[in-house]
Amino acid sequence: MPLDLPGPVWVVVPTYDERENLTPLVSAVRAELDEIAPDHTILVVDDSSPDGTGDLADNLAGADSHVRVLHRPEKRGLGPAYIAAFRHALDAGAEFVVEMDADFSHDPSYLPRMLEAALDADLVLGSRYVEGGGVRNWGRIRRIVSRGGCWYARTMLGVPISDLTGGFKVFRRGVLEAIDLDRIRSQGYAFQVELTYRALQMGFRVVEVPIMFTERRAGQSKMTRAIVMEAAWMVPALRRTPPARRTAPAGGLPERHL
């Protein structure tokens, strides 16, 4: 049964060398959204992948009107890819904008619950670190680094969010319109922290939905030392950012966490 959504859903999937994952991911997302959100679009944002991901995305788009492709001339970072996609989706009339990875780390089966949560929230976070969430197929060191990074960001910024670094989210249109995307400075995964923090600064209602994060099925991880270092210095810089003008949360509801 379709959800009572007030507008179109756009799912943004950034890609760089994700040829092995893209076709099954698009099929899985379509299977989840066809019934609950018939008015949906999957926007693949490809940074000129040398493995031919962009060409494959074009073929998928040619065969399916629910798929579109945004080509970028070079690899410029996760943040700029998402910002370009957000603007594209907003210009096309999106009411809900989903961001998710292409490698099945973010299971499309969570989309119905996250979209349902977005009916009375402004930003929904797929959270690994609330009750019911977790990670699979990670080694001890990666678990420590991830947990430590979330604790560091949460403590430094003073926000009641368990998973600030996750990249599975649903934005209501108003959040992306209110945030000055030109002010976003992060290039890598610090982008996730920065967007959520700015939404909280502005008084938007942010909720967390538990997810199980699974290590990628195929391909290579995009995590690098430079990405980790950017996150380390960006968090204190965000703390010094003057509060933005506050905006009333959706429906005037107080914040809560799922």
Which ranges hold each PLM region?
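Residue-level signature of catalytic and energy-coupling elements of molecular machines
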Residues: L22, V29, A85, D103, ...
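Hydrophobic helical membrane-anchoring modules
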Residues: M1-G7, G158-V159, L181-L258
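N-proximal low-complexity "stem/linker" segments adjacent to membrane-targeting elements
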Residues: M1-A31
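A conserved acidic beta->alpha catalytic loop
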Residues: D46-D55, F104
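Acceptor/aglycone-binding surface of glycosyltransferases and processive sugar-polymer synthases
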Residues: R68-D91, F96, P108-Y189, R216-A231, ...
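Acidic helix N-cap motif at the loop->helix transition within catalytic regions
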Residues: E20-P24, D51-L60
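Short beta-strand/loop segment that forms part of the nucleotide-sugar
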Residues: P38-S49, L70
